């Protein structure tokens, strides 16, 4: 799938959430990059789900900086079909992330509707995480 087809498919599926994000009216839970940095270094870090493409996650696509260490790669287009694999985390803290913090709100909606209890979006996304100088990796 080309990058433009990918973007169109994602927008077609999640346009309502993206519009709400643009208007700042989502009402969905978010976590700041500073809060996540503290949580990542705690005794019980959250499950981090990076919803970008595998290429962006690995630093070989549009985003060349990779991902937050210990984040799990699940493309937004595959998230619904991955719900079963995520069941062990149903009652645990989960943080979803994307480049800017908008599309990860759609992931929060998907997981919340599937019964997950503590799901938040990374406010400002991986772009803000990187801008603040927090670590990323391509491995």
What are these regions (language model features)?
Residues 61-77:
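A short alpha/beta connector and helix-capping loop motif
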Residues 1-63:
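Flexible, polar/low-complexity N-terminal or interdomain linker segments that lie immediately upstream
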Residues 74, 83-130:
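Catalytic cysteine-centered active loop of the rhodanese-like fold, especially the PTP/DSP P-loop
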Residues 30, 48, 71-73, 119-121:
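Conserved beta-strand scaffold positions in the cores of enzyme catalytic domains, especially
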Residues 35-36, 78-83:
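Short acidic active-site motifs
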Residues 133-139:
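Active-site neighborhoods of enzymes that stabilize oxyanions during catalysis
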Residues 26-27, 44, 68-70, 117-118:
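A short helix-to-beta-strand connector/capping loop
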Residues 61, 83, 133:
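Short, flexible helix/strand-to-coil boundary loops that buttress conserved ligand/catalytic motifs
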């Amino acid at each position: 799938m080309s990058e433009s087809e990918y973007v169109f498919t994602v927008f077609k599926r999640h346009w309502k959430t993206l519009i709400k994000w643009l208007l700042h009216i989502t009402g969905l839970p978010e976590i700041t990059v500073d809060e996540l940095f503290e949580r990542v270094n705690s005794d019980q870090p959250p499950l981090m789900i990076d919803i970008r493409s595998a290429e962006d996650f690995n630093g070989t696509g549009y985003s060349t900086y990779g991902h937050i260490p210990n984040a799990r790669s699940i493309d937004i287009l595959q998230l619904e079909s991955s719900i079963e694999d995520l069941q062990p985390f149903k009652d645990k803290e989960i943080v979803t992330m994307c480049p800017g913090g908008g599309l990860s709100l759609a992931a929060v909606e998907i997981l919340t509707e599937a019964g997950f209890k503590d799901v938040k979006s990374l406010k400002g996304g991986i772009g803000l995480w990187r801008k603040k100088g927090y670590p990323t990796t391509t491995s």
